[in-house]
Amino acid sequence: MNPLIASASVLAAALAIGLASLGPGLAQGNASGQALEGIARQPEAEGKIRGTLLLSLAFMESLTIYGLVIALVLLFANPFAS
């Protein structure tokens, strides 16, 4: 494997997992804070808010998993290496 392609793949994998975890991490913190604020304002709606929060957190976490998959493909099954 070309050393330039190998080093670029490692750098791209690091960027993929770093950026893929940054956005959802910030969004999950924001969503959790807003959900807690909503529960504090309307305690009777706690069940609906919690269910919606857990579903949205799962969708946000899937973005991080996609970034992990891209990073693993770049590291171990690199399509650019011949």
Curated annotation (Swiss-Prot):
One of its GO terms (cellular component) is proton-transporting ATP synthase complex. The keyword Transport applies. Its main location: membrane. GO terms for molecular function: lipid binding; proton-transporting ATP synthase activity, rotational mechanism. The chain crosses the membrane at residues 3-23, 57-77. The record marks E61 as: Reversibly protonated during proton transport. It comes from the Bacteria. Keywords: ATP synthesis, CF(0), Hydrogen ion transport, Ion transport, Lipid-binding, Membrane, Thylakoid, Transmembrane, Transmembrane helix, Transport. The keyword Transferase does not apply. Inhibited by dicyclohexylcarbodiimide. PROSITE patterns: ATPASE_C. InterPro entries: ATP_synth_csu_bac/chlpt (IPR005953), ATP_synth_F0_csu (IPR000454), ATP_synth_F0_csu_DDCD_BS (IPR020537), ATP_synth_F0_csu_sf (IPR038662), ATPase_proteolipid_c-like_dom (IPR002379), F/V-ATP_Csub_sf (IPR035921). It is a multi-pass membrane protein. It holds the Pfam family ATP-synt_C. F(1)F(0) ATP synthase produces ATP from ADP in the presence of a proton or sodium gradient. F-type ATPases consist of two structural domains, F(1) containing the extramembraneous catalytic core and F(0) containing the membrane proton channel, linked together by a central stalk and a peripheral stalk. During catalysis, ATP synthesis in the catalytic domain of F(1) is coupled via a rotary mechanism of the central stalk subunits to proton translocation. Belongs to the ATPase C chain family. F-type ATPases have 2 components, F(1) - the catalytic core - and F(0) - the membrane proton channel. F(1) has five subunits: alpha(3), beta(3), gamma(1), delta(1), epsilon(1). F(0) has four main subunits: a(1), b(1), b'(1) and c(10-14). The alpha and beta chains form an alternating ring which encloses part of the gamma chain. F(1) is attached to F(0) by a central stalk formed by the gamma and epsilon chains, while a peripheral stalk is formed by the delta, b and b' chains. This is ATP synthase subunit c. The lineage of its organism: Bacteria, Bacillati, Cyanobacteriota, Cyanophyceae, Acaryochloridales.
